[in-house]
C-alpha cells in the first residue's frame, strides 16, 4: 500500500462569459505560456463561428462533440514476463473528457489547410465531432479497436 497522499481533485471555476465549466477546461487546455486572454479569444471566436455555421447553441455543440469523442477504455502498457503488452483499462469520466479535448485540439492542429486560422480549424473539427465524423472520432475508434483486440489480457490488474 502506497503511503503517498492522494492529490486533491482540481475544481474548475466556470467561464465568466458562457458560465460553463467545460469551456473553462478547454480554455485552460489551449492556453500557452499563461496567455489566457489569447486562449479565451480563440475559443470565443470559434464558438461564434460554430454558432454561425450550425445556427444552434455552440455550448450544446461543444458538449455533444466532447461526449462523442470521449473514450471509455484506454490502453496501458504493462510488462508481463519478458514482453510489454497492451492492456485495456476502463477510465473515469474526467480522464475521458481530458483525452477528448486533447484529441480535438490535436486533430485541429494537424488538419490540412494550414492557411486557415486555428479558429476555423477548431470550429470545423468540433462541428464534425458533434456529427460523429472527423479525426478525433477516428482516434477514439482506433483506441476502442485496440482495446477490443487486446481484451483477452484484461485478467491482469493494471492499477
Swiss-Prot record:
Domain of life (superkingdom): Eukaryota
Keyword rRNA-binding tagged: yes
Gene Ontology biological process terms in this record: translation
Entry-linked SUPFAM superfamilies: Ribosomal protein S7 (SSF47973)
Record-linked InterPro entries: Ribosomal_uS7 (IPR000235), Ribosomal_uS7_bac/org-type (IPR005717), Ribosomal_uS7_dom (IPR023798), Ribosomal_uS7_dom_sf (IPR036823)
Pfam families: Ribosomal_S7
Keywords: Chloroplast, Plastid, Ribonucleoprotein, Ribosomal protein, RNA-binding, rRNA-binding
Record localization: Plastid, Chloroplast
Keyword Plastid on entry: yes
Predominant cellular place of this UniProt entry's protein: plastid
GO MF assignments: rRNA binding; structural constituent of ribosome
GO cellular component terms given for this protein: chloroplast; small ribosomal subunit
Family: Belongs to the universal ribosomal protein uS7 family.
Oligomer status and interactors: Part of the 30S ribosomal subunit.
Role summary: One of the primary rRNA binding proteins, it binds directly to 16S rRNA where it nucleates assembly of the head domain of the 30S subunit.
Name by which UniProt lists this protein: Small ribosomal subunit protein uS7c
Organism: Bigelowiella natans (Pedinomonas minutissima)
Gene this chain is encoded by: rps7
Amino acid at each position: 500500500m502506497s503511503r503517498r497522499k492522494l492529490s486533491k481533485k482540481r475544481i474548475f471555476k466556470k467561464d465568466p462569459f458562457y458560465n460553463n465549466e467545460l469551456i473553462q477546461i478547454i480554455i485552460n487546455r489551449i492556453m500557452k505560456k499563461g496567455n489566457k486572454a489569447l486562449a479565451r479569444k480563440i475559443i470565443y471566436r470559434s464558438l461564434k463561428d460554430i454558432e454561425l455555421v450550425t445556427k444552434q447553441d455552440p455550448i450544446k455543440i461543444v458538449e455533444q462533440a466532447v461526449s462523442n469523442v470521449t473514450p471509455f477504455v484506454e490502453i496501458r502498457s504493462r510488462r508481463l514476463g519478458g514482453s510489454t503488452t497492451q492492456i485495456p483499462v476502463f477510465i473515469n469520466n474526467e480522464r475521458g473528457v481530458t483525452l477528448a479535448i486533447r484529441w480535438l485540439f490535436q486533430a485541429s492542429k494537424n488538419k490540412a489547410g494550414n492557411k486557415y486560422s486555428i479558429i476555423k480549424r477548431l470550429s470545423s473539427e468540433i462541428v464534425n465531432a458533434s456529427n460523429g465524423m472527423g479525426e478525433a472520432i477516428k482516434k477514439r475508434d482506433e483506441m476502442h479497436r485496440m482495446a477490443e483486440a487486446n481484451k483477452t489480457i484484461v485478467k491482469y490488474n493494471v492499477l
